[in-house]
């Protein structure tokens, strides 16, 4: 699965600021509810992200984090992705000790988690590529961020193609 099949341009936020990881998760949950879920899941999304983070830090190193969580099917029956480029890095307790300024959040329906394991591995590989990170950080708009993901996807074989 390509990034552009999972993420939509409308779910990219550029130039946002947060004081903490908790405020970031609150904002992701609010954004998801406001833009996608039509007032039926903000608290559930926040709690799922926050509880999942307690199990293990989602910082990938080099200033990027990929918070992810299982969400009830009653909240959404399809995966939801949000990308954020922060104005100011936040302390994230990442394993490398570096603050985080790029966030790729992924909310997966609880009945589809197994399907997304290979997708997560592919996302992590792409999101930790130093050239991709450099381009994402230098992007000045959500459109430029989207273009980075489109270019990244052009060089990818989709998961479905690999299975055949």
Curated annotation (Swiss-Prot):
Q: Which Gene3D superfamilies match?
A: Mannitol-specific EII, Chain A
Tell me which stretches of the chain form a coiled coil. Answer: none
Task: Name its GO BP terms in alphabetical order.
Answer: phosphoenolpyruvate-dependent sugar phosphotransferase system
Give every PTS EIIA type-2 domain span.
5-152
From which domain of life does this come?
A: Bacteria
Keywords, A to Z? Phosphotransferase system
**Single GO MF descriptor:** protein-N(PI)-phosphohistidine-sugar phosphotransferase activity
Q: What does this protein do?
A: Not known; lacks the phosphorylation site found in other PtsN proteins.
Q: Which NCBIfam families is this protein grouped with?
A: nitro_reg_IIA
Protein's name according to its UniProt entry: Nitrogen regulatory protein homolog
Gene source species: Haemophilus influenzae (strain ATCC 51907 / DSM 11121 / KW20 / Rd)
- Top-level taxonomy: Bacteria, Pseudomonadati, Pseudomonadota, Gammaproteobacteria, Pasteurellales
